[in-house]
């Protein structure tokens, strides 16, 4: 599923440039992806679109505010993942709304262990969906793999 998400990022400049789900599924199948992975990715993307559309901008929290994670979020997101989100927010890459979308979409992946590499793909996809400008160095970092899975995610 994560390979499909990276493929979409590389193939479409913005989420709005993606074709409709049925046409996208055919394109992904023609590109060699498995039907099960395609369905997982499309379901996850539909959830991202739904949550992003429902999310209303909030009053920006104070720069000194700290996000406290629930016990369940802590079981789903390792200290490294939570630290990475804090780093991105402190660096100005993420705002509070993006961070919350990332946490929600990561927790929604109950069938997957959320490694740092997978979290980076989730971050990339949330920024892509929200069409937020991202520095090239940040994109390189998000496409690099820190997991035991090895190779960079760039195709």
UniProtKB/Swiss-Prot annotation:
- Source organism's superkingdom? Bacteria
Q: Name one Pfam family in it.
A: DUF494
Q: Which family does it belong to?
A: Belongs to the Smg family.
Name of this chain's protein: Protein Smg homolog
Query: In the record, what lineage is assigned to the organism producing the protein?
Result: Bacteria, Pseudomonadati, Pseudomonadota, Betaproteobacteria, Rhodocyclales
């Amino acid at each position: 599923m994560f390979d499909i998400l990276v493929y979409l990022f590389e193939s479409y400049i913005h989420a709005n440039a993606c074709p409709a789900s049925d046409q996208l599924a055919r394109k992904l199948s023609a590109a060699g992806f498995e039907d099960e992975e395609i369905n997982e990715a499309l379901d996850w993307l539909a959830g991202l679109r739904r949550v992003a559309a429902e999310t209303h901008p909030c009053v920006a929290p104070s720069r000194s505010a700290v996000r406290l994670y629930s016990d369940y979020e802590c079981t789903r997101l390792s200290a490294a993942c939570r630290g990475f989100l804090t780093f991105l927010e402190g660096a100005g890459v993420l705002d509070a709304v993006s961070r919350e979308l990332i946490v929600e979409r990561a927790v929604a992946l109950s069938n997957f262990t959320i490694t740092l590499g997978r979290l980076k793909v989730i971050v990339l996809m949330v920024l892509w969906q929200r069409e937020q400008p991202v520095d090239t160095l940040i994109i390189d970092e998000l496409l690099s793999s820190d997991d035991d899975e090895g190779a960079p995610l760039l195709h």
